[in-house]
Amino acid sequence: MDYRHPNALGVNESSRAYEEIFGAPRKREPARTVSTPAFMEPAPVSKKPLPPPTRRLPRKPLPFRSTSLQPPSSQPPAPPTHQREASPVKNIEHSESFPSVFGTSNNHQIVPLTLKDGNDFGALYASLNTTPHFPQVSNHAPNNSNSPSLTWHTSSGDDSNQNPFFVRRQSQSSTSPVSDSVDENLLSAVSSVTESVETNLHLDQNYPYGSPVRSSKNPFLSSNSRLPTDDSSHTVGSHSFTSGTHPPIVSSNSAFTLPNAVTPAAQAPLIRSVSEYPANVSPPAQSLQLPKSTSNPADLHLSIASASSHKNIFSGLDVFSNVFHGPSTTLRDREHDMRNRSFDHSTLAHYEAVKQQRLGVEPTARSFTLSSYKSRASGNSLINDRSSTTTPTFVNSEASSPVHKNKRRRRIYAALLSRVASELLDRLQLGDITKDGLIYSNAFTGDHAVTVLMGIIHTSDRNLALLVGRSLDAQKFIHDVTYDHRLRDSHREIYQLQGTGYRPFLRANDNASINNKNHHKELEDNESGTRISPSTLGDTSFPNGIFTLLTHCYSPTCAKDHPCYSISCPRRLEQQHRLFAKMRANTEQSSSLAFDDKEQKLWIHSVPQEIAYSVSDRERKRQEVICEVIYTERDFVKDLEYLRDYWIKPLWASSCIPERKKEKFIRTVFLNALEVQAVNSKLAEALTKRQNYKPIVDNIADIFLEHVPKFEPFIRYGAGQLYGKYEFEKEKSSNPAFAKFVSDVERLKESRKLELNGYLTKPTTRLARYPLLLEAVLKYTDEGNPDKQDIPKVINIVRGFLSRLNVESGKAENKFNLFHLNQQLVFKPGEHYDLHLLDANRQLIFKGPLKKRSAGSTSSESASDVTLFLFDHALLIVKPKTINKRELLKVFQRPIPLLLLQLFLVDDNGLRIPYSSKQQLAAVSKAANGKPPSRFYPFSLQLLGRRGYEITLYATTEVSRDKWLEHIDNQQTLLQHRNQWFESVTICSNFFVGDNKVNAIGVYDSGRRLLYGTDTGVYVSLRKANSPLQFKPVRALNIPNISQLEVIEEYSLLLLLSDKVLYSYPLEMIDADTTQAPKKARKVSGHTTFFRVGICLGKVLVCAVKSSVLSATIKVFEPVTNYSKTRNMPSLKKFLTVNQDPLRIVKELYIPTESTSVHFLKNKLCVGCTRGFEVVSLDNLETQSLLDPADTSLEFVEKKENVKPIAIYRMNGGEFLLCYSQFAFYVNRDGWRSRPTWFVVWEGSPQNFALSYPYILAFEPTFIEIRHVETSELIHVISGRNIRLLADGRGKLGDGGEIFYACDQRGENCETSVVCSLRLTSAAAHAKEQHVDK
């Protein structure tokens, strides 16, 4: 089926419309062929004359045309002419080889002007008379009477309503007068040009690329017109179209006037003839010129200008139709010459639709602009700047407009309210706005909404944009936060979108790719603002309707000056004025009604006149404010009674809501509104009594002081209002019976055309109005009045309630938003992370859109959109998705706990810089100065641990990136201070540098002395308790590569492990003079992997482990008793005793698997090996597994590969805490799992553990993970580089009992080992003491 434009008329329809409008049938003549080419000398050509018309009916006058313009009766009727369909044109060119389609005679020459739009879409023909001429003769015309010249001039008259187009014939040799008759076809064509250019083709000086600017009165107008043909002379403005030999007629009272609908800022070129340029200056390449013949060169110059009062010019030609006149005119069949064909409206629409479909754009109205041309005003016309070399070019506005090129804002049909609402949803900037002491989230101001609507409908008229906004308001798409009035163009009025309260997270186009170029701008405007989405309950419900003031006219015969037959044609300015007048009348009527209603409530009208004028002006104003306080209080109570009588009670009696949830629904939606009504009804009654007691009310503060302290129900009501609104909307959308009930009640006259949400917000807004009203009363209160001291007290009490209301409603809103966010989250298959979003203290700190580049990509165009949520405990990265018409948030990566997060700045070279302060941020920003601005600003997030990852995100502005870093850093600092149960105290720093790393530590002498085992030997230093002083260590032993060190102070023995050899050394020799100390330590055991010291069977035992992949040998040593008494021995006996072996071997065990740890139980040893924990008896050396194989809940341990048992701790109640390299759990003394719900998966890969009840510390190279042993909650994380445990603080062999660790820090030239001690804070120690007492 052929394409048909919806506005196009069929053949029969077009003929009937033509006959109805112009009073004569439309005639079509067959095309005739001619042989005379265009722009040649007149030559006798044989042609077949046109047959006479078979029917000639009197034509009705044109609409709004003056009767004085009809042809005089004395003038013979002109032969009929014919007009074909209008064609859009763009470029104006001459074709030397273009044949004329007219026959020529002695008095006529046909000059075609081909106007093209990339395709050959028609021609403009002008008839030239070779004998007559105007009195004005071009000075540049050649002295040849047979050289015709066609010039389009502008009259120099002062009439502001001029049509700038007319044709004059010039000749130097002829002086014949010019006929006053005007060819009607040419008049129709020029009129069509006028209205088309005037309507669609305006150049705004603010658009440097020639972007079209629509008229503010009629933004969308059809460019097609059909006018009748006649030979009568007509005058357009002060311009005359002439043919024949009569003088021209110049009239300023013509009905063909130029409407004032052209943008005043428009500019237009003036195209001069070749002869007007100096000899040394070449004309523009595309100036209109007649092609020069061999003997008779002709000049053709066309001037385009407009009335001087408007300074409007026409920037292009949109639609021309073929114009024919003269008795010898013949038609040429378009099949014979495809370059000179003209199409009807439907054919052109078809070509345009096909072209736009190929380009992949939505079919739109076609318009053309004259771009890249500069002009200046001179007198009554715009004179072209001769210095400019830019030539006028008619180009398509869709191609030349910078808006179209960048596609930052799509153009929509502004008459469709659904399109306007969708665009408004995308462009609005939402945020938290405070009004009357109340904070409204996801709100916007009225003037902002009007400004956005102006950009959407492309108008500079704020009143028109306000009308469109009120059309959306009428369908409840937007509403005032207090539901008091409609949309107003004011920054003081606050509004919200429908359902914004429970749709706070997504935006309608959040899932758009960065390839959508308008998305980049939106991100720049909304980096930190709240973004909304369609309702999570279903599809977005946009308003439906047509805003008739912005609609197009669908009649193809409609023109600017001649509106079509429809009474609702948008071109009828009179109708628009009537509509606006009606609206103004309605507004004035409604405002007058409101004024009358207000007059009845004024104090001056409620008391006798003599009393009203007996008081001073100040007191009169005070009484007016007091009267307003009293009657508004009564109105507030009536509103609450309306809720009770028309909503609550009918709902209890109705069956529209199921009985099982009716009570819960009513309590959730209406909350304690009846409690508020009970409190305020007593207040209103007391105020009314005071008012009735005396016409002049002396004071009211004492009444408020009595009732305001009872405003506690307002707090509970405000906290649950958001949930009530959500339940109401949810029930209304899912329950048709309830929806009908709501509709019926809201239509009652008692509702005053206000929906239920407007009444539900009354209590909170009323509480916020009390301070404003009372401050107004206080303003006009004299000093001696008791209200002068009492009113401030009342205001302070009310503001205290307002502060509590804001806090509670903020908590409720945060909890509500987290609840819906938790419902929207979607995890990858097989993954689920419990973010504890429903916890009572959980908070959403910050949220916003960011960019993420795909792996391996360096182009910013390949970035994708993600949304980042910052909670009080974690970061969440999601991708918005729409699945089954439901907005969901797909979790992009594993949530990052803030305790395990590391922030990095990324410089221009891609290097990561750890973020720790604002100074570093300032340094990076300073380094970026002087370089071209970047499109995106990156920062990097790193998750520590075994399952960690790193991701780089990009903000669109530097301010946005800095804000993200600031929020994350502040929340991390707050969280660390809140959960800092351990404090890290530096013991030694800036001493062990380079390769001399600290690997072990020993404490003795009640913690006053420390021994450091390093790669170069053993160092000793002093230490003062609870003192930040650091003492310089001194080398005591020159034994290299010490990996383990233990001090057995009871036996005055030091054990060292160096290069897998276990040594012993007398402890007292460390304190002696280095000259008396023995040179070498005593060897205890070789090929030792590690050793452990502990208490078993009531004895101090030393276990030296020699481990390999297939087996492990454990030697059990016991210190010699006499060795510990050498301190008090005489020197000789002491010397002999020292030479004895300090350790004697007790047992030697063999285990057929690799061993990783040894632990001491009460009577047995527990060895950690690849098979798990094995219990070994020292009596009979029997070995058995600690875990009972009968417990099937422990099968995961046996099936898990590459899991190492590292530590075991005895807990209260006979339980054991087993710590592996990946997880931890509890078992009882029988080897069965004791706490099924307690299970810890370590974030990192721990290598050592330490217990400081009630906390377990897991040490891995990059951080220390601290968890609570009862709740398994992650309490604290201490990060560092190359962290290693030095002493776990277990037992009381040494008096220290502290936990020591070492880490590396980067110095100026090398790395330094820093030794730290972990201690419980005072609060944690106090909590631990209380737990022990229990």
Swiss-Prot record:
Positions where Phosphoserine occurs in the chain: 381
Low complexity bias spans: 138-149, 170-180
SUPFAM superfamilies documented for this protein: DBL homology domain (DH-domain) (SSF48065), PH domain-like (SSF50729), Winged helix' DNA-binding domain (SSF46785)
Polar residues: compositionally biased ranges: 150-164, 213-227, 234-245, 381-400
UniProt GO BP: cell growth mode switching, monopolar to bipolar; cortical actin cytoskeleton organization; division septum assembly; establishment or maintenance of bipolar cell polarity; fungal-type cell wall biogenesis; positive regulation of cell integrity MAPK cascade; regulation of cell wall (1->3)-beta-D-glucan biosynthetic process; regulation of cell wall organization or biogenesis
Listed Pfam families: CNH, DEP, PH_5, RhoGEF
Gene3D superfamilies: Dbl homology (DH) domain, Pleckstrin-homology domain (PH domain)/Phosphotyrosine-binding domain (PTB), Winged helix-like DNA-binding domain superfamily/Winged helix DNA-binding domain
Annotated region (Disordered), positions in chain: 1-89, 135-182, 203-245, 381-402
Domain CNH positions: 995-1293
The PH domain, residue ranges: 843-973
Listed GO MF terms: guanyl-nucleotide exchange factor activity; phosphatidylinositol-4-phosphate binding
Location in the cell: Cytoplasm
Keyword Cell division: yes
Domain DH as annotated: residue spans: 621-808
Alphabetical keyword list: Cell cycle, Cell division, Cytoplasm, Guanine-nucleotide releasing factor, Phosphoprotein, Septation
GO cellular component term, pick one: nucleus
Main location: cytoplasm
Source organism superkingdom: Eukaryota
Stated role: Stimulates the exchange of Rho1 and Rho5 GDP-bound form into GTP-bound form. Controls septum formation, cell wall synthesis and localization of F-actin patches. Coordinates actin deposition with cell wall biosynthesis during bipolar growth.
Protein name, UniProt field: Rho1 guanine nucleotide exchange factor 1
Species in which this protein is naturally found: Schizosaccharomyces pombe (strain 972 / ATCC 24843)
